[in-house]
């Protein structure tokens, strides 16, 4: 898995961080560790070798810039070279809100295309636009039903032919006509291989009918280096492929290989799938990606994620916190927000110093604890939530019984509440920079000691 790659790279760099003296021998030892970590993640050996030579040359020959120590300079060199390996400059999906846009998703069967269609619709929906889905895959059993379930989950219109009596081209034509009120049409096409001439011809027809703003190739991250051949085959067949979406990176030991292989053919990776949920789609930024991989965090993405999941009740609770009020009501609202943000391990990876260092078991334990805390608070009266100091022996017994937990767990919750309240105690309106909104104020206050 990618967190294993992150752990191995972090351990290699720790040898530099913890060293009393950095010499040529240590640099070579660290480079060897980096090589091993990348090759285990299925990154092309030639790419790894060329990158290693560049790291060694710069680490030995270059003098650190003013204000940088030798250690910091070497870590920066490694960071820069890893970013280069993945394509350097991020490229975003550009959509004009004033015009109707069409996105065509193509890829091999089993790459995760249908799920990615729904994820992309959800991503666009969160940007304030009105997406709609067209199910044009009539060949895979249950493809329409799968997309229908996902579209209902995110409340996005869907057009398709459950009877499979129409051709994909007919479905797309009719779908465009029926979904006129939508800003962005996302078309889920049938999975295909480069040798399937009829399917490639079908895709070309769809392209002519829809005149898509972007054709996105969906690639399975578990393919590792083989992703390069697949991406190249599609790029040769359909020269207008605008970008790549790499899926299944959360559970692949070959994710690094897939990303570097695709980057090698100069096909821009715009999105990566980081989990099974409809919200587990991220724009791909090589700098942020490597930063998180090395445990340096990614606060900008974390703040964006918190803003995405905030609703009216969260806003109200944040207003209360910023005014100095913090009860179990506010705590509950914050736990709700954290739960919506995604897997705990992914969230912790965005916080500097954590990266891939949070054990899977610890992340699962934390997620379970958050759920249990919410169940315990559901067993409390509003009076108890607003005045936690009222919770003494008899109330403790009643709450524990109602939640189906031990009294010690209620005490653990109250202790967590007291600690959190203390952390929020120093918050004063206007004290923190406004970047990231109200939630940004709170998160920055908690992450940095002043």
From Swiss-Prot:
Binding positions (GTP):
107-114, 188-192, 247-250
This protein's major location comes to: cytoplasm
Q: Which reaction does it catalyse?
A: GTP + H2O = GDP + phosphate + H(+)
Record keywords, A-Z: Cytoplasm, GTP-binding, Hydrolase, Nucleotide-binding, Ribonucleoprotein, RNA-binding, Signal recognition particle
User: How is this protein organized at the quaternary level?
Assistant: Part of the signal recognition particle protein translocation system, which is composed of SRP and FtsY. Archaeal SRP consists of a 7S RNA molecule of 300 nucleotides and two protein subunits: SRP54 and SRP19.
What is this protein called in UniProt?
Signal recognition particle 54 kDa protein
Q: State the family named in the UniProt similarity comment for this chain.
A: Belongs to the GTP-binding SRP family. SRP54 subfamily.
Q: Which GO terms describe its molecular function?
A: 7S RNA binding; ATP hydrolysis activity; GTP binding; GTPase activity
Recorded GO CC terms:
signal recognition particle
């Amino acid at each position: 898995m990618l967190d294993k790659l992150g752990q191995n790279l972090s351990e290699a760099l720790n040898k530099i961080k913890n060293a009393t003296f950095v010499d040529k021998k240590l640099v070579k030892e660290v480079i060897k560790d980096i090589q091993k970590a990348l090759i285990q993640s299925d990154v092309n050996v030639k790419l790894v070798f060329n990158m290693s030579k560049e790291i060694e040359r710069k680490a030995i020959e270059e003098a650190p810039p003013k204000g940088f120590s030798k250690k910091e300079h070497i870590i920066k060199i490694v960071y820069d070279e890893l970013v280069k390996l993945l394509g350097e400059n991020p490229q975003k999906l550009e959509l004009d809100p004033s015009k109707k846009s069409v996105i065509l998703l193509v890829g091999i069967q089993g790459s995760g295309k249908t799920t990615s269609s729904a994820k992309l619709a959800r991503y666009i929906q969160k940007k304030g636009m009105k997406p709609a889905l067209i199910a044009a895959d009539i060949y895979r059993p249950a493809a329409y039903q799968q997309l229908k379930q996902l579209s209902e989950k995110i409340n996005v219109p869907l057009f398709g032919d459950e009877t499979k009596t129409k051709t994909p081209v007919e479905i797309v034509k009719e779908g465009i006509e029926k979904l006129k009120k939508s800003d962005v049409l996302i078309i889920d096409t049938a999975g295909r291989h480069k040798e399937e001439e009829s399917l490639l011809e079908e895709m070309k027809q769809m392209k002519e009918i829809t005149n898509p703003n972007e054709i996105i190739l969906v690639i399975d991250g578990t393919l590792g280096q083989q992703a390069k051949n697949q991406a190249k085959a599609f790029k040769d067949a359909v020269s207008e492929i605008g970008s790549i979406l790499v899926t299944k990176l959360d559970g692949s030991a070959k994710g690094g290989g897939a990303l570097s292989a695709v980057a090698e053919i100069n096909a821009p990776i715009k999105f990566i799938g980081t989990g099974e949920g409809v919200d587990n789609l991220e724009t791909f930024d090589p700098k942020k990606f490597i930063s998180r991989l090395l445990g340096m965090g990614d606060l900008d993405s974390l703040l964006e994620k918190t803003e995405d999941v905030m609703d009216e009740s969260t806003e109200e609770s944040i207003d209360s916190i910023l005014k100095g009020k913090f009860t179990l009501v506010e705590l509950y609202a914050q736990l709700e927000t954290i739960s919506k943000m995604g897997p705990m391990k992914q969230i912790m990876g965005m916080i500097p110093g954590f990266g891939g260092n949070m054990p899977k078991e610890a992340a699962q334990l934390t997620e379970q604890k958050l759920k249990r805390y919410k169940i315990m608070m559901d067993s409390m009266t509003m009076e108890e939530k607003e005045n936690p100091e009222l919770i003494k022996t008899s109330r403790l017994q009643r709450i524990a019984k109602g939640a189906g937990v031990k009294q010690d767990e209620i005490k653990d919750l109250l202790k967590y509440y007291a600690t959190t309240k203390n952390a929020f105690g120093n918050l004063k309106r206007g004290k923190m920079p406004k970047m990231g909104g109200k939630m940004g104020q709170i998160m920055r206050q908690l992450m940095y000691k002043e």
